[in-house]
Structures are given as C-alpha cells and as structure tokens.
C-alpha cells in the first residue's frame, strides 16, 4: 500500500465547505459517545448527567491521547466524570469500556455488510478479505466479552495462581473482567440502546467520509465507505496502545477503499491523508472543549490519576 502522495495538492484543491461539513459530522459523531455511555451507566449515578455535556467531556479527554500511549484519554475522561458528577471512577471506566466494546461489535457488523462487495482479485483484494475477516472476528469477540464478561474473571483468577508474569496478567484480567461484570448486569434493553447509539455513531462517521469524498471530488462506492469505517474503527484498537497505531488505520482504509470502494491506490492514499486532516481538525475542536472543561481536567484529583496512568510511573 505504499503510495507517493504529495499532500499539498490535496489542500489546494479541496473544497473547504464540504471539508468543514465533514469535520462537523466527525465531531458530532464523537460527542454522541455521551449518549451511549448514559445508556449503560448505572442510573443511580447519572441523574444529573446529560448526553451532550458528557460527550464533550469524553471528546475533550482525547487531547491526552496525542502525547501519551494507552487509554489515557479514557482515564482522563472518567476521572473528570468523577470530579464533576461524583460517579465512582471504576464504574465510569467499566461502563465506558463496556460501551466501546459494543461499539466495536457494531463496527464489525458494518464491515460485514460490505464484505459481499469486496473484490478479491489480486493481492489487494486478498489482503482486504483476510484482514477484514480477522478484524470482524475481533469486533465480534469484544462484543461477546461485553455481554458475558464472567469468563474473563474466571480466566484471570486461574492465571493468578501461575508464575509471576502470568500472575500479574491474570490479576489484570480479573480486575478488568470484574469491572465489566459490575455493569454487565444491565438488561438487554440497555445493551440494545448502546448498540443502537453505536450504529448511529458509525452512520455519522460514514457520512463524514462521504462528505470528504465530495470535498475531494472523489467517487467511491458506498460499500467501500462502510468497509473503511468498519475496519478502520477496529484497526484503531491498536492505536489505544501504540501512538499512531503503526499505520493500521491507514492500511485498513486504503485496502477497503481499493477493494470495495472502486478507487485507485493513489486516490485511496489521498483520501487517507485528507481523513487524517479531518481528524486533526476534529482534535482542534476537542481542544476547545478541553478549554471549556479545563477547571475539571486540571483539578488535582484528575492530574493525579493521569500521573498514575503514565507508562513506567508505577514500574
């Protein structure tokens, strides 16, 4: 997927109105995360919470992910939720991760819908088909974990009896599984609401991609956009632990746009560069939201949690 794409012609030729619309859709989709969170979080803690303010708080927390690997933005957001609304951090983190797992299952469904339209001719199609299958299985698996986290608790408890390294891994799995289980007793209606909000978020993300194509005067099949959104969202899981995700998002989107979108490799590379521009402009908006929540994020309790989340801090 190596492409020689000069970004300057992209910036010179892009239509700013459609680009701004794409950024707006991208930001709106991310803010809807607040509604998805409230659909799953225990009601006794969410009486004063509203979807859009919570969503802006989560999106503002993504600023921290620019400089630190791992789910630091998520930690910042749930610490801010505790500071602002009094919800226990463990409950907020569990509900957030649980909802994101369901979101990955919806991304897998979106990619699965586009699979029949993938061209498997040549190396690109084979890579897209094979990689897409793996990513879909990951998404479905994480969705299954979100519904039945009990097996993770049992596995973690068993591993704690092993060697030091396996014991530490088992302890982490057990704590994580117990956190998921703490909100995993929600009724099926709550799970369906989370899944519905996740699909809504995915649809707005696809709409952002479609308007970006209009900004670039690029014609792509809808199946390619669905495939790019589904596999791209799943590939970003790597980005939770490695800054930039080692190009997994770019590979997933380029492969999807070529294999199912009917565009050339160079046009797909151009689209990815423009998509990253949308992400950066969206993060600029998240910086504005961070400024609005600065008194919460910069409080001593939130800063303390972030220091504890830094790599090597507790080594």
Which ranges hold each PLM region?
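Hydrophobic alpha-helical membrane segments of integral membrane proteins
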Residues: 75-80, 93-96, 106-108, 196-197, ...
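Short intracellular "coupling" helices and adjacent cytoplasmic loop segments at the cytosolic face
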Residues: 45-48, 59-76
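Transmembrane alpha-helix interface/packing and boundary motifs in multi-pass membrane proteins
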Residues: 61-69, 214, 230-250
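Re-entrant/interfacial helical elements at transmembrane boundaries that shape
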Residues: 72-83, 113, 241-259
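Membrane-interface segments at transmembrane-helix boundaries
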Residues: 44-55, 76-101, 219, 258
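Predominantly cytoplasmic-facing regulatory/coupling regions of multi-pass membrane proteins
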Residues: 1-59, 117, 121-237, 263-273, ...
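Membrane-embedded alpha-helical segments of transport systems
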Residues: 60-68, 91-112, 235, 270-286
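Interfacial segments of multi-pass membrane proteins
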Residues: 81-89, 228, 232, 250-267
């Amino acid at each position: 997927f190596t492409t020689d794409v000069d970004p300057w012609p992209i910036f010179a030729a892009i239509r700013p109105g459609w680009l701004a619309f794409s950024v707006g859709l991208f930001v709106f989709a991310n803010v809807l995360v607040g509604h998805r969170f409230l659909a799953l979080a225990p009601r006794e803690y969410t009486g004063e919470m509203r979807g859009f303010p919570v969503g802006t708080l989560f999106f503002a927390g993504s600023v921290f992910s620019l400089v630190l690997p791992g789910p630091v933005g998520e930690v910042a957001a749930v610490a801010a939720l505790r500071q602002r609304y009094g919800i226990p951090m463990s409950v907020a983190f569990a509900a957030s991760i649980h909802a994101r797992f369901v979101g990955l299952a919806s991304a897998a469904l979106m990619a699965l819908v586009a699979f029949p339209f993938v061209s498997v001719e040549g190396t690109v199609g084979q890579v897209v088909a094979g990689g897409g299958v793996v990513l879909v299985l990951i998404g479905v698996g994480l969705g299954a974990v979100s519904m039945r986290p009990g097996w993770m608790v049992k596995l973690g408890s068993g591993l704690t009896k092993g060697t030091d390294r396996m014991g530490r891994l088992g302890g982490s799995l057990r704590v994580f599984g117990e956190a998921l289980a703490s909100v995993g007793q929600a009724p099926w209606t709550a799970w369906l609401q989370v899944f519905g909000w996740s699909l809504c978020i995915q649809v707005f993300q696809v709409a952002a991609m479609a308007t970006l194509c209009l900004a670039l005067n690029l014609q792509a099949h809808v199946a390619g956009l669905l495939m790019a959104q589904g596999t791209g969202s799943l590939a970003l899981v790597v980005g939770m632990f490695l800054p930039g995700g080692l190009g997994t998002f770019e590979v997933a989107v380029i492969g999807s746009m070529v294999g199912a979108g009917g565009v050339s490799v160079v046009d797909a590379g151009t689209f990815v560069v423009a998509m990253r521009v949308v992400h950066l402009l969206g993060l600029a908006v998240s910086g504005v939201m961070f400024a609005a929540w600065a008194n919460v994020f910069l409080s001593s309790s939130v800063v303390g949690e972030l220091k504890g989340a830094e790599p090597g801090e507790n080594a």
